UniProtKB/Swiss-Prot annotation:
Record keywords: Coiled coil, Cytoplasm, Developmental protein, Differentiation, DNA-binding, Nucleus, Spermatogenesis, Transcription, Transcription regulation
Naturally occurring in which organism (per UniProt): Homo sapiens (Human)
Protein name as it appears in the record: Spermatogenesis-associated protein 24
A Pfam family that the UniProt record links to this protein: SPATA24
Subcellular location: Cytoplasm; Nucleus, Nucleolus; Nucleus, Nucleoplasm
Taxonomy of the source species: Eukaryota, Metazoa, Chordata, Craniata, Vertebrata
One GO CC annotation: nucleus
Transcription regulation recorded as keyword: yes
Amino acid sequence: MATPLGWSKAGSGSVCLALDQLRDVIESQEELIHQLRNVMVLQDENFVSKEEFQAVEKKLVEEKAAHAKTKVLLAKEEEKLQFALGEVEVLSKQLEKEKLAFEKALSSVKSKVLQESSKKDQLITKCNEIESHIIKQEDILNGKENEIKELQQVISQQKQIFRNHMSDFRIQKQQESYMAQVLDQKHKKASGTRQARSHQHPREK
């Protein structure tokens, strides 16, 4: 427990020590008074001189006066102690009340922090899920792009093969046409030679 303002453990201990010392003094004084009374009783039983009796009586009066002062001082110190204890009790209750209010506020703050932390974790998880989904979509897109590139290459190769085939086909056609022309010319030439020979033979007859 925190030490109240205006009051310290050392101060409390000093007051208690002073009260104990006062109680010891009172007990000693009461013991001395008791002894003096016994002396007075003995003086009554055994005759003593007037001077001795007056001296003892004076000392008894002084001790009674000192005893009364000590009791008054003790009462004042006890009153101070009770007042101080009352202040300590009030301050302790106030401190306990403030402690409960602080713990309640701290609990509320912790709860809010946990809620915010939970929201933050949820947002991070959501962002990670979105990022993962985007990465997957990018992978799929890259795969499609690669497929398209491969198809484009295949189409390009097929076009080139087709061009080569068309070129070979044209060459072949040209060659066939050329051969046909050559053969046709040879055929015509051979036919002309035969006709010329057939015209020459009748003349010889």
